[in-house]
Amino acid sequence: MSRGEPGSWGPVVETGRSRRLLRRLAVLAGVGGLLTLAAVGTTTQLLVERAETNLTRVPVPELEQVAERSDARYFLLVGSDTREGLDEDDRRELTLGSFDGQRSDVVMYLAISEDREQVSLVSFPRDLLVEVDGRTQKLTDAYAGGPDQLIRVLRDNFQLPVNHFAAVSLGGFVDVVRTLGTVEICLEEPLRDRKSGADFEAGCHDMSATEVLSFVRSRQGDRADLERIDRQQTFLRAVLGDLTATRTLANPRQVYRLTEDVATGLTLDDRLATPQMLGLADELRSVVSAGMPMTAVPAHPRRIDGLDFMVPYGPGARALFDDLRSGQHLAERGTREERDETVVGVASVGAGAGIVDSTLRFAGFQTRVGARVGPTDELGAVTTVFVVPGEEERAGWVAATLGAPSLPLPDEVAVPDGVHVIVASGDDATT
């Protein structure tokens, strides 16, 4: 699907029929919700039995075996836009078109370190460029071959191991929102999107399930799918915050309903037993409650053979995946609002200035091309972040996004007005 076309989630009116249809749509959070329920101390036999009754399990042969209980764990989380079970009226109501297969509408990667001290969530753009059997393809289309093909794609393209698979129905998650009542989402600016149905003023909103749906569907903004990823992660943080709040989980009846809501929309691989999953979550209690680092794969747009792709930014993506595999804490990359208020001056030293500029803009930073860093004899090969005095934190966000080293700004370099960070683009940006 090219940018600008209607997404697979059309405007929804919350009628009885729409509630039934919502169960067939997909977004990610059910695993996080179920893990969080367990992590706050609800790992009772009743919870296990209720979850197991409502879960769906499938075999996924491509998964890597976990040798020891204490090993690191890597989950592939998918929301699918499959039309299975939808009649023509359903498709028209939800603006789904005539596509009969399935694609991954949301792809996230959850990494849990061996020492259980780090839990990180990374979103993949739907239009991310990947190779499938020697052919160029969008990541969203790779799921047409099922979970095994998507796992192979992540392994072959990014060397990411996958131990467990989960597909999550939006219906179950919308039921979680209904059980919670509302979810508070705060917006820095108005959001109006005819395609998703979003219509919000700037400020904080107690969103209903229908309003949340319009919010997380929206691709409104210059960064298209990366805008939607930001909104999905904002939603996840808000819901996980509500789930870990004492007021939410103090009511046993509410806990019971939440467990049923999450599990009903959840499909898991058949290797992850419910007691094992809840036991893992119990080990992560303090980490989940403290907040889960979330980010997206750094990428830049490119048009290839008439199709719009997001191409992974090589150095930044490789550094991110290395951290996930090794269980390292993900470096801070700033909030969406903080990145939007950070201006990066891009100095063209190597061959990758345009790619660096585009990657930073799609990550949410403001950029100015044409900054100067003085003599470049030792630069050109490796993209380097220069730290403006007093802007160390912002420089860290940029360095983490680009997977780049940082150096103090040379005394002789003048900082343009309004610029917070300077980046000297290198040839490595093209790899």
Language-model segments: which ranges?
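Non-catalytic, solvent-exposed segments at the cell envelope interface
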Residues: 2-431
